[in-house]
A protein has these predicted regions:
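Conserved phosphate-binding/catalytic region of the ribokinase-like
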Residues: 83-190
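Ribokinase/PfkB-type carbohydrate-kinase core domain
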Residues: 1-114, 177, 183-190
Length: 190
């Protein structure tokens, strides 16, 4: 993590979307700036890295990012450090996503607030990695130009699939399995 800043966005071609997630402080700062300078839309997801930044630092990330993503604890900390509510932050970016574990998630877009339900879970095995799985669904939906209702539900289902599997990244499925479970969970086709 302390060497993440050595990797440069410009070292890679064909990047359509990015994410700045918990890493070394300098790496997070530099990657956000590099994405912004390259005109590459990105999610700022500070996660457990948030304590490294004060309100001014966080506002610089907001000004560079296209989207923001937090869990409920991080959202409260973001509001405390910046003095802005999630709704006010959503006026500065395309959307703010706040996950709330088994309570679902909320997506703030400008003046709209979407409540995204959780997907049904058959077996609660291990929550480790659920946030990452959710972010994977978020990036998939954004990368495919989907609307927020679909993006949120894809991300929700990713978290549900993950929590049913022991280990942070041991879950797997086929596209057909995912599409069927999506239909069963939300009553709509993917």
């Amino acid at each position: 993590m302390n060497h993440a800043h050595l990797g440069k966005v410009s070292d890679h071609s064909g990047i359509d979307i990015g994410i700045v997630s918990p890493d070394g402080r300098q790496g997070m700062i530099e990657h956000a700036q590099q994405f912004a300078e390259a005109g590459i839309p990105f999610v700022f997801d500070p996660g457990q890295g948030m304590p490294m930044f004060d309100g001014d630092d966080l506002m610089r990330f907001v000004d560079q990012a296209t989207w923001l993503a937090f869990n409920d604890y991080e959202a409260r900390l973001m509001e405390e450090r910046t003095g802005l509510s999630m709704g006010r932050l959503a006026e500065r970016v395309e959307a703010v996503v706040v996950t709330r574990g088994g309570e679902g998630s909320t997506i703030y877009t400008g003046t709209h607030q979407l409540e995204i339900p959780t997907a049904p879970v058959s077996d609660l095995r291990d929550p480790t990695g659920c946030g990452d799985a959710y972010r994977g669904g978020l990036l998939y939906g954004l990368g495919h130009g989907m609307d927020w209702e679909m993006i949120g539900r894809i991300a929700s289902l990713m978290g549900a699939i993950k929590i049913e599997t022991q280990g942070p990244q041991n879950h797997h499925f086929t596209r057909d399995e995912f599409e069927q479970r999506f239909k069963d969970s939300f009553g709509i086709r993917l």
